[in-house]
Each structure stands twice: as structure tokens, then as C-alpha cells.
Curated annotation (Swiss-Prot):
Protein's gene: Adamts7
Signal peptide boundaries: 1-20
Comment on bound cofactor: Binds 1 zinc ion per subunit.
Binding site for Zn(2+): C191, H369, H373, H379
UniProt propeptide residues: 21-217
Domain PLAC: 1541-1581
A Pfam family: TSP1_ADAMTS
Lineage of the organism: Eukaryota, Metazoa, Chordata, Craniata, Vertebrata
Disulfide partners: C299-C353, C328-C335, C347-C429, C386-C413, C456-C479, C467-C485, C474-C504, C498-C509, C532-C569, C536-C574, C547-C559
Protein name: A disintegrin and metalloproteinase with thrombospondin motifs 7
PTM (free text): Glycosylated. Can be O-fucosylated by POFUT2 on a serine or a threonine residue found within the consensus sequence C1-X(2)-(S/T)-C2-G of the TSP type-1 repeat domains where C1 and C2 are the first and second cysteine residue of the repeat, respectively. Fucosylated repeats can then be further glycosylated by the addition of a beta-1,3-glucose residue by the glucosyltransferase, B3GALTL. Fucosylation mediates the efficient secretion of ADAMTS family members. Can also be C-glycosylated with one or two mannose molecules on tryptophan residues within the consensus sequence W-X-X-W of the TPRs.
Top-level taxon of the source organism: Eukaryota
Any single GO BP term: extracellular matrix organization
Amino acid sequence: MHRGLNLLLILCALAPHVLGPASGLPTEGRAGLDIVHPVRVDAGGSFLSYELWPRVLRKRDVSAAQASSAFYQLQYQGRELLFNLTTNPYLLAPGFVSEIRRRSNLSNVHIQTSVPTCHLLGDVQDPELEGGFAAISACDGLRGVFQLSNEDYFIEPLDEVPAQPGHAQPHMVYKHKRSGQQDDSRTSGTCGVQGSPELKHQREHWEQRQQKRRQQRSISKEKWVETLVVADSKMVEYHGQPQVESYVLTIMNMVAGLYHDPSIGNPIHITVVRLIILEDEEKDLKITHHADDTLKNFCRWQKNVNMKGDDHPQHHDTAILLTRKDLCATMNHPCETLGLSHVAGLCHPQLSCSVSEDTGLPLAFTVAHELGHSFGIQHDGTGNDCESIGKRPFIMSPQLLYDRGIPLTWSRCSREYITRFLDRGWGLCLDDRPSKGVINFPSVLPGVLYDVNHQCRLQYGPSSAYCEDVDNVCYTLWCSVGTTCHSKMDAAVDGTSCGKNKWCLNGECVPEGFQPETVDGGWSGWSAWSVCSRSCGVGVRSSERQCTQPVPKNKGKYCVGERKRYRLCNLQACPPDRPSFRHTQCSQFDSMLYKGKLHKWVPVLNDENPCELHCRPFNYSNREKLRDAVMDGTPCYQGRISRDICIDGICKKVGCDFELDSGAEEDRCGVCRGDGSTCHTVSRTFKEAEGMGYVDVGLIPAGAREILIEEVAEAANFLALRSEDPDKYFLNGGWTIQWNGDYQVAGTTFTYTRKGNWETLTSPGPTTEPVWIQLLFQERNPGVHYKYTIQRASHSEAQPPEFSWHYGPWSKCPVTCGTGVQRQSLYCMEKQAGIVDEGHCDHLSRPRDRKRKCNEEPCPARWWVGDWQPCSRSCGPGGFFRRAVFCTRSVGLDEQRALEPSACGHLPRPLAEIPCYHYVACPSSWGVGNWSQCSVTCGAGIRQRSVLCINNTGVPCDGAERPITETFCFLQPCQYSTYIVDTGASGSGSSSPELFNEVDFDPHQPVPRPSPASSPKPVSISNAIDEEDPELDPPGPVFVDDFYYDYNFINFHEDLSYGSFEESHSDLVDIGGQTVPPHIRPTEPPSDSPVPTAGAPGAEEEGIQGSWSPSPLLSEASHSPPVLLENTPVNPLANFLTEEESPIGAPELGLPSVSWPPASVDGMVTSVAPGNPDELLVREDTQSQPSTPWSDRNKLSKDGNPLGPTSPALPKSPFPTQPSSPSNSTTQASLSPDAVEVSTGWNVALDPVLEADLKPVHAPTDPGLLDQIQTPHTEGTQSPGLLPRPAQETQTNSSKDPAVQPLQPSLVEDGAPTDLLPAKNASWQVGNWSQCSTTCGLGAIWRLVRCSSGNDEDCTLSSRPQPARHCHLRPCAAWRAGNWSKCSRNCGGGSATRDVQCVDTRDLRPLRPFHCQPGPTKPPTRQLCGTQPCLPWYTSSWRECSEACGGGEQQRLVTCPEPGLCEESLRPNNTRPCNTHPCTQWVVGPWGQCSAPCGGGVQRRLVKCVNTQTGLAEEDSDLCSHEAWPESSRPCATEDCELVEPSRCERDRLPFNFCETLRLLGRCQLPTIRAQCCRSCPPLSRGVPSRGHQRVARR
């Protein structure tokens, strides 16, 4: 299980019917079944009742020190057991609401608002044996678990024998079988549904609106997740209606424990506020096998049933559906899905929901996983670097691996995700504490509630039982299904018995009853400031503290408060030639393979999520998110005028003083916190009317702002911008006019606008370098006006900052009278920036804060009253509440001075005492007599006594408190017998694929333990079954199939990013020690058909140069000579054109009608002269001549491979010579070691330019040789680099050449080149120029240049004509369409626009539109969009006002049912003012005494308008006019007085002085005083009407 999931054993025991009826327990799950008859006794063991329901236990006041106790006694195996139990008041809150819904009709909804206090916890005692813990529910008999002599025993009533009045109800007690040790791993899994982009954009937009309210530091605050849990009808059908409630609470308690684990890094409480149990299917909630549809239906349904307002006790923040349906990813398959939720959907009314499939107690991990997705947590390894290492288990792993002895925890990435989610303010709904009516969890360890057999029945059905001696139960739970043992690779839950006096806890078998002590977390000290995240350009340093002193353990509280601080550093700007910080982060991925290739990554800006790292491969448009968060200090918006930077993945605002969230701004000329007094505006007009080309208009200096450049009137001229470098233009340079738009110029953005012929340039600035304004003259200039704002010259030079201490204003006086204290605080000031952080000033020179007294006039006297003391009597007359009353005056904030009562005479004196409990009659008491003798002589008898009500108060005695009149008495034992009732089996089950071991299973015979050789191996990720491993076969009759599956947690996030944006060549072939793609590998024709090989196919595209090893075509039996080929330069014009003049047209320029590269024969390029197409020409290239002798080329290494980079050479034997035949084609060939010419029967078409450097040579005309060389042609194969021609054409043309001569054999034998004699009168001959190689852009033309003698050496090389030159017809232009703009309206019909430009395809330089007119039609620039009808806005109820008075703000949720489909202009307000009335209220005192005992009197009370903030009365009562004025008087004693003749008063009965004092104190109104002092207190006059019937004025 999980470290941190340590459930306190002192809380809930068993809810009613947790274990199910007795008939549902399989006989193999019980041992030692006994029948007992428990009775209720008192603390001393005296009999009280056969009735086990503790009706006398009533829940006392919450402040009661201890709960009521109950005692039970029973005889078990001849031993007398005494149960001492106490009520568990914390299982459910007083306002617990459990709804049972039937047939979707509200009238049939049963709501349980209270539960009986029949859940008891305590211990069992035995005089001899060791007792232990007991958790018993006494709601319907005794049902639960207790420990005796370190063994677990279960007790429950016998259903076959109902309880009889006056008789003890029979119960059965049975032991729980112990299990062996096990060990293995386990897997389980769920998957979150990704949140929609609309939701993410909505959240980001909300975050930006809340920026001003957010603090810069990271604060750890307690969060309360108020949860609605819904159990569907399948759950009720499976578990049974009485049991499902306790089962669900047990699951949710385990989930709450997971979220209390310290590894999550935040104090989060999972609280169930509402539980809905669906006995029938809901009309509006359709639960199907299709997981997506079920989640969608449930999210809609839970939103409708949610209570409005966070303050409602049953309002929930998230909803969880638990179902027994077998969930499937799609309609019918795959069906291994266990859970579904929306990522980052928490607190969203429509998306804060999840669905989980019930598979037994491991359901808790599924619920925790899906709830983690709602917190915005991604799977570990998905978009982050927290992929599970080995088998280290994490809760958010895509496939959870439960390693032995290692509990599930939260990974570092999960902690960062949830912290970022909360710091962004996306969890505002979690800030409010739950109201009354919250459900408390059962905190008994789940293994105590559900033993191993019960856990097996939950997973596999009623007939399943625990397989003993298979593995350690704390690691893996194995259950029987038929004759085999199955396992879902889950460990048994905490509290499961794993041996004698032991249970499982955190994956380990520990002594039973062991519960680690709860330890609350404590903050460590602040760490040192970290290294600055950047060396320039505003970096971030941070200091943080951890909740590690100590680390919270065992349900201890997590630390609350500030956990991280930030400070900016290295504020100086970076060098301009350095790439951006975001670009540097993208380039870190250049060395990583992406789709099988290496790419150069460039950044892509993302305004919706500016702090995520989005990049794309250079020259490709598709983008990828490479990191979830950029490094601290990365600008949020690259290229904009903004200082905002990213910190921990959140965009933080930076003021001009470079303090986070300071709000400091610059004035219009760049002075931080300035008032514009130092700004100077420069305005000039350029009036030269005539000019040629580009003419300077004026210079805008660096630091200029509010720049405006415009033509005075329309003209055909063009504005241009350039830097101080004459060759560097920002706009409209190089005689090219650009389109309207925004252009980056000198560190700022200029907006270029042209309406008709009138041009304007605007920019907010500031410029980082001087910018020249130019005018490109086309006609007469009507004038150009420009202006800008800059700081005055005296302040333009950069000055070092000056920091000093300054006093701020005096604080407000905290009191209105009685002397208060005002303080004057110090601030650190900078001369230009104003108030800055105190760290910039010298602390040694810091002056002291100033103080002074204020409002020293004395406060008026007022009555001070203390708290009411308890009533002096609890019943009957004569009891009083009393309190102290003093006249005091405030002389300070915390000091009061006592005065004489006369000083408060202007105020009515509050009452010092009032009667209490006089209406409560005191109860009577019971009296008891002595016990009689026992009624029997042996065994159990009865003795009696008398019980009487001692009635001396006139109140009957309480029957519930009446003592018993009879009790048991026990003498020497009598013999008696017991009977045993056998029962059937019950439980629950499921059918899902799982790992199982087939075992010859016998429920009555233990399964033998595997031998050490068959110890389990680590679980593999694959599904392969190793059937041949002998170590997997245990000895004896047990055999293990080990069919393993790993799909409990299915990853719904399919990796769609691997779609190729180009062909991926990931398969590589090793050729000659080099790894090359497969499309470059040499071809391999059949070995009996040697084929001459030209350049390797694809070598030109891949840019691969060098020698190619030959295909292994030649065998020792082959008589055909091999042809040696090498790769050649890619471009035939490389020798004639410079790099600047090389043909450039479209992005991939190819020369028309030329096969390139030409065939190469051992480094010599072969071609055919136009005059004689049948000659195979060999180009001389002395630079490629190897220095090694010809014979060295045939040397082989020991393994038979040729040495050196060249191919195998020709054999040394000469070619046989025969006379030439006119019908056969002949070819000259110089058989030097570096050049071989062969007759192929093909015509090779090559670039004519090369023929100037070629010379004809002749090959032998031996038919045998020709047959051998032409073999490839006759068999239909051809070299990849040669172009065949028909044989007829070849033969015809070759017969026309008289210069064809056979080779001399000696030349071939010697291997020497042929020497040709120089010709006389030779001259250069040129052919016609070819057409331009391109139709647009920069191309090339060439011509044939050759010597008339056929040998270039006969002609003068210095006078050789140019064979090629470049040509340029026109620019290659094409329409380039930009991205469509955002639709002007999301619904109701809108339009989107885009920019369409005519550009040069070479460098994407903008051109005038006429360049593209010959081509395709210009693409449209506008299209319709957002045609769907608009939906109405959804508004929630208003939340509680932020202030109780004095003006506050109310908020409500305003959202669109379908994001983007609502009219933005009609969006309702989400805030409104509230409680605008002043902070005053009427305060009333207690009603005074009635002015008359009868005949109509008046009661009066004090009514004052009091300021609730100061606690003082307001002089103006109109300030309380927002409340109804309470009555200050009311009539009383309206009954008529009896007409009794007053007795004659002779004298006062009390002493005269005492009566005079009472009269002065106003006591004569009291009837008793008036009767005792009849002379001093004359009777009331009846002639004057009472003022009690008059309305007293309000003021």
C-alpha cells in the first residue's frame, strides 16, 4: 500500500452490514464457528438488558469531554468476554446527507439526514487471554470485528434465528484464516481525457485578467476538495443497498490518504459532502460501456444536480461516478479502461468530473489517478522528464507498477503540475472550508473491514476465496476462480492480516495494532538565493523552503504559508548578435533524433500559453511542444514591448523598476514612474520637391518614442527606412516595395500603411539604434512630415542609480479618542524609478521609524459588561445568570480605566443579572432495594430487587433511567450444549482479464508453496508468454501459466505527433563500414549478369560523396571484366560558374534533359560527343589519378575484401583483338588503370559542356568482348546511371566514323596511356549556345567547345572560349498566402482575412503583383467563417460578497456552453458591486422590566446605531437606515388587575433608611419592594396615561 496512507484505528469501525449476511460467508473463509448469546451489562458486569441496541446512548453536546459508553458480555468457548465500547461520533457529521434515488422521481428520493449513534469502538477484555481492539456496530445486533489473543474474530447475528423479547439473540463468532507470504509486482492503470484547447485558452484569459490580484510568491494554502460521490445501480446490485454506503466511504477514505501524502507538496483535503446512491437508472444519466459517452453524460448530469453557491453545505467542487459497468475506450473495444477524466477540469462546472470502474478496493487508486488529471497533472513521461525509472511506482504513471515494499507516491512532475495549477489561481473553488454536513470517513484500516476473502469476493465474485501460500499477501493478492488462482497484481489493502499478530501496512508485514505516530510538517529555513537563471537580459533567482522539518507523516498536516520567493538579476541587455533565450532552449534539442532524423529547431511563439516551449524544425511548418515550461527568465512575448517574464511556467508582470508585480510604468518618454515633465517632442517637415532614387529625409535617434512619419499629400513616391549602414534596409530597400504590415525595425515595431498613394509609418518605440528616413522618388514630393518624442538632453545620458532612504506619509490614527499612535515608515527611493525594494539601500544608514501620538482627547465613559456566568441553578426557581458591569473609559488601545457609576449616568446601566431555568421543573429520582437470593443452585439464575420512584417534586420519574429489577446470578457451572449452524457463501465478483496461475485448487487442501527456484520474476511490460522457462514450473501438482497482462491503466493520449511531414528514412544499411539509408544502397543484380554501375542512386539528394564498393556480382567463374565506377561531382557547371553564379531558380534546380551525374568509369566521367553518339568518351582527370600501381588495386584483405577505397580493378590479361565489323558498334577505350571504356550497346546522354574536356579513344572490336560487355543489355537490365538507346541507332551511327581503330594489346598489357601526336593548324571550335536552363531566376547556358583535331592539347588552352555562362530571364515569382486571421465573429456569421503577397521564390522577397500575373490566379484574401448560430451565455448564481459592508464585489461564473459559440459583445458581467451600505447595524439591549404588573405596562430596551468595525456608537442614526429600525418599547402585562381594596399602609415594614435607598435606586416599581416600603413607595397614579403605549422616537 502507500506510505502516508496510515489510517487511524480509533475512528470508524464497521458501518451496518459491512460484512454482509451470515449466509454470504463461505465456509472456507471461517474457522472455529461458535454460537454465543451476548447481553448488555454495566461497567461492573451486571446484567442490564437482552436488548443490544444502546438506546440510552444519546449524542451529547459537541463540547462534551467524552462520549457515552456501552458494555457487552458473552460466553465464548468457556470464557467470559467483556466488551468496553464507546460511541464513535466522528464517522459521519451531523448534517450528513445520503440520498437513495429510485426511478428518477424526486418524490421517491429518500434523504437520510441523521444516522443512529450505534457505531462503537473500544476493546475486548478477558481475565486470562490477551485482549485487543474491537470495532462493533450495534444497530441490528452486534456486527463487527475484534481481536483476541492476537487473532481476528468476526461476530454477527444468525439470520435464521430472529431476536425474541426477553431472550438473548444468538450470534456466531468465527476466526479469520491467516495467509502465507507473497511477493510480486502489480500493474493498474487509468487515463485522463485531455482538456479542450478552448478550455485552456479560457483559463489563460482568466489568468491574465487576474494578474493584478496575484502575488509574486508561491504560497502553500490548505485546499478543500468538496466531492460528490455517485454509486450507480450496478454498484447497488452488486454490493447491496445497506453495504454500498460503507464501501464507498472506505474507498474515498483511501483516496484522501493518498492526497495527504507529503510527496504531493500541497495540503489538500478530499472531503465528501454528498453521497447519491442510484437504486434505479436515472432518466438523464445514461451509463454505458462507452467510456467517453458515459463521462459526457455524467458531467452534464452532475452540473444540474449541484447546489448553487459555494456556501451551500452540499455544493461540490468535483463529482466522481463509481460504476460496475465494464468501461471501453470506444463503443465495444478495448474494454480495459478503468477511469476517465478531463485534464485541468477542476473547478470548471462542466468538466470537473470523472468516472471510475469498480474493481474492488484498488478502485481507490483509479479515483486518485483520475482526480490528479482534474488537477492538471499529466502522465509521468508525457511532455515531461518524469518517466518511471525501472519500476519505481508513481500514482500518475501511465501504467502503475506496484513494486514490492514500495508504496505509491506522487512524482516530482506531479508535484510541479499541481503546484502550478494552484499558483495560477485555477483552484479558487477549493479555498472555502466545507460547511456543516460534511461526511467523515471511516478511519479503520480497510483490511480490518474487508479480510482477504472479502477482498477476493469483491474482485472475482461470491465463490472466490483467498489462495494461501502462493505469495506474500502484502505484495500480491491471489484469489481462486474455479480451480485456478488469479491475481490482478494488487497488494492486499492496509490492515489485512499477514501472519500471527501481524497485518499489512505500507506494503510491509508489521506487528498488529502498530500505527505510526502522526507528525505535522514544519518549514525548513529559507535556502540561499539560487544562481541567476540568465547571464544577461533579466534572469531570476529564487529562495525556497521545504516542508521537511519535520516531514508530515501518518496523516500529519502539511505546511501552510509562503514557500518560494523570487528576485530579478542580471538586468543588463544581452549582445544583439546572441540568439534569443527561447531559441537557445529550442536548440538544445538539435542533437536529439526526431522521427528518425536530426533537425535544427527554431522557436514558435504561442500567445495562448506563452510559458510553454513550442519549437519547429527549420524549413518545416509543424510545431511541437518540447517542454511544458520554459526556463525562468524567458520573456513571455518575444519581440514585443513587454518586460513580462516566465517563472515556474507562469507569466509574471515586471515593472519598469524591474520588480515583480510592482505596477511601475514609464511615461511617454521612457522615465520610470515619470510624469512626462522631461519629455520633448521633435517635429520636422522634409520639403525638397525633386530628387533621384533614394534621398535622405531625416534621422530618428535611438530612444525615440511615439514616432509618426507621413506624406503631406498623396504621391507615387515611397517611404523607406534604413540603418546607419547604407547597405542595411529595414523597409522598401533594394528598389523593392513591401506590403502594408508590421515590420521589426531597430528593436521596435513600425506599422507601414499605404492607402491609395498616401503612406504612413507609426511606431510606439523606443528605438535601439538610429534610423534614417528615406524617400524613393517617383514624382514631385509634396512633403514628408515626421515627429517623435525623446527625453531631454540633460537626462539622455545614462546615469548610475542613486538610492536613499525617505520617510513616507503618517499612518492613519488607529483610534478616534483615548490616544493612539501614528507611524511614519521608511522607503528606499531611487532618483529615477521612485520607490524600490529595500535591498537596494544601505541598511547600516537606515534611520529609525517615527512615531507620534494622536487623538489624545479622552473617550466618553461607557458601560463595560463581562460574560454571563453559568446559571446558579439547573432547575426550579431562584436561578440567575450574572455578569460584571463597570463604568469605564478607554485611555489607549488596550487599556481601560474604571470610573464611578455616576460617570455613565447618561447611559442606561445594563442588567447585571437575569433569572434562568425557573421554568424547568427539577426531576424526581429512583430508589432501589437490596438484591434477593439467587433463584437456582447451579448455573445461571435470577435475583431481584424493588425499584420505586421517590417523587418529591411533582414530576414523574424518567422511565428510560429506571434501574433494572432483575439480573443474572451465577453459581457452580451446569452442563449445557451448543449447536452450530452452517451457512452458504456470498460475496461479489467481476469478470475482467487478469493474470492467473492455474493451480489444482482444492478449497480444503492448502496450495503448496513454490520452491525457491520458482521465485517470481519481475513483471515485464510485454505480453509475451515464456513457456519454455523451467524456473516458472513449481514442483508437485502446481503449475503456473503466468499469463500476464498490463492494461489496467490505458493511455488515451495517442501519440499523433509522429505523423511525418517528410519521408522518414529510419532503416539504415551498413555498407563498407558506413551506415547509409536503404534507398542509397547498391543494387544487386543476379550474379551471372555483371552490370556496370554508375553513381549510387540517391547520392545526389543525400549529398553523399566518395567511392562506392562494388556489388558482389563477379564470381571466380565469371569471365566478364568488372567495370570500376566512382561518384562524381553533382553539378556539371561547377568548373565554369562561381558560387554566386551557380544556377539558381526554383528551390530545387535541375538541368533539363540531362541525366546527372553521368556514368563514371573508375573516376573518369563517361559521355558521348554529339558528333558521334556511339563513342564512349573517357575524361582525363589527372587529379584523381591514384599514386599506387595498377596491380595494387587487386590486393585483398584476409577476409577477401579489397584494400583501399577503390573498387576491384580489371584483370591484367589483355582483351583479345579481332577485326572490326562494320555491323558492330565500336567504342574507343583507354585501358589505363584509371580509365576503361566498354561497349554497352546504349547511348549515354550527358551534358554537352563536358565534351570540351573529352577526347575519343577506341576500344577493341572483338565480338567476344562485345558479347560479354553487352550481356546486361541482352538480358534486359541496365545501369541506374546510363540511358539506353535502340541498338539499331547505335550500329548505324558507329559505322560512319572512320577514326575507329582497334586497341593495341601491348597498351592494355602495359597499362600505359595512349600517346597521340599533336596536330597542325588545330583551332578551337564552338557550338551554338543552349537555351537557358531555367525559365525564371538565375540559370545557365552552355555550348560545345572542342579542338578541331579532336585533342584539346593541340589547341592553345589560354585562348579556349568560355563553355558556359549564367542567364537571368526574370524573377521566379509565386503567390504566398499567409495564415488566416482569427474569425471576426465566432458565431452568427463572420469573416477571416489573410495576407497574400507576390514573392520571389528564391529568397521569399516581396515583389510587385504584376510579377505573378502570368501564373495562377491570386488566392482569395477573405473567406466566410463562424456561420453557426450563437448560443446564449450561461451564468451561475452570484457568489458571496467579498465585503460584508462598505462596498464589496460579487463574482459569478459566465461561460459559453460551447466555447467560442457565444456573442462576445453580449457577454454578461461577471462582477457587480454589493453591500454598499456602511458598516453599521442596530444593536439592541435586553428588554427592561415591565412598568406595571397588570393593567398594561411598557417594556423598554436600548437601541443604538453601532459601527461594526470600531465597536462605537454612531451619532447619526441615519447611518443604519439600510436596516429596519428595531422597536425600543413594547406593551406588557396587558391583563386586567384584580380589584382588591388596598390595605392601609401604616408604616414601612423595612427600615426607613433602607426603603429610601431603594426608592432612590428606582426599585419602587417592583411589587415586592412597594409592599415592604408602602410609605416610602406610594402607589402608582392611575390618572396619568402610561408612556408605554406611546412610540418612542428613533432618535
